[in-house]
Amino acid sequence: MQKKQKIDRKGALYMAEQLTLTWIGHSCFKLDCGDYTIVFDPYEDGYVPGCPPVRESADLVLCSHDHKDHGASHLVKRIEGRENPFQIQVIHTWHDDQKGALRGRNQIHILDDGTFRMAHM
């Protein structure tokens, strides 16, 4: 059975009653699961034209690669001490077709809490 989805006008996609996925800008998203928060691919201030500065707090920050438009984990305020509800699988890939020679490594994160599964690339 597929869960109902609803997209609101603020960019949040509700996948389940206690899961909220919010687009921050560019490739940056915030996933709230109950009281646990993950931010994906925060970008440096002013580096992505038209995107607001990343001013989020999170239990965990996951970056697909270490470029300024995806790897500014230092901008996210960390929340300590809460248990991660997800099993996280990391698949290492290349950011180009030259085995990383041009743009480096990339990581795909697959999150699974037993009822919800998503990938961020």
Segments from the language model and where they lie:
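Core dinuclear metal-dependent hydrolase active-site scaffold
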Residues: 11-60, 67-68, 77-121
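Short, Lys/Arg-enriched N-terminal segments with co-localized hydrophobic residues
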Residues: 1-14
